[in-house]
Amino acid sequence: MNDTICHYTDAMYKQLSPSLKYPQSQLGFYLALKPMEGAIEGVNALINSGLYDVYILTAPSIMNAHSYSEKRLWIEQHFGIELCHKLILSPNKGLLKGDYLIDDISFGKGQENFDGKLIQIGTAAFPGWDSIIEYMLGYMLPKTLYQNYTFSQMKEEI
């Protein structure tokens, strides 16, 4: 979730109390996070495609016990209550199995032990959600269905 579908690092640097060593420890920190560009539309496109059983897997902050409830509320606010039924909070992402894990880092929270393919957002291969959607939906659909279909057109239809 952090720096994958919401701007976690930006919020850390823009905190009103820059003297705090752990700004993420403040009540309300996670609720105030802004969505990443294209993330809401991208996740919804994956869900609506019917090709994937989409779950949100996020590591909680040990510095903020409220991160559990705030992350859940953030998902409800941006995606609706239905996706909250598919929210998994785990400090070790390697404990879970799946076909794909979309994350901003490749190790440190068990990503290196994830049993499927890691799609690392923010890299040359996947700089943002546009490239993830092109890969995920383009990979699964016949080329004639997506070759002239841009992400902005997809956003208009969702």
Regions found by a protein language model. Name each.
Residues 48, 94, 111-115:
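Short, conserved loop/helix-junction motifs that constitute active-site signature segments
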Residues 13-17, 74, 117-120:
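Glycine-rich, phosphate-binding/catalytic loops in enzymes
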Residues 46, 54-65, 136-157:
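Membrane-proximal envelope and lipid/glycan-remodeling enzymes
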Residues 34, 39-69, 75:
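Substrate-recognition element of Asp-dependent hydrolases with the DxDx(T/V) motif
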Residues 100-141:
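Acidic, Mg2+-coordinating phosphoryl-transfer loop and its flanking beta/alpha structural elements
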Residues 58-100, 106-109:
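Substrate-recognition "cap/lid" segment bordering the active-site pocket of phosphatases
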Residues 50, 80-85, 114-119:
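Structural alpha-beta junctions
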Residues 1-33:
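Active-site neighborhood of HAD-like aspartate-dependent phosphohydrolases
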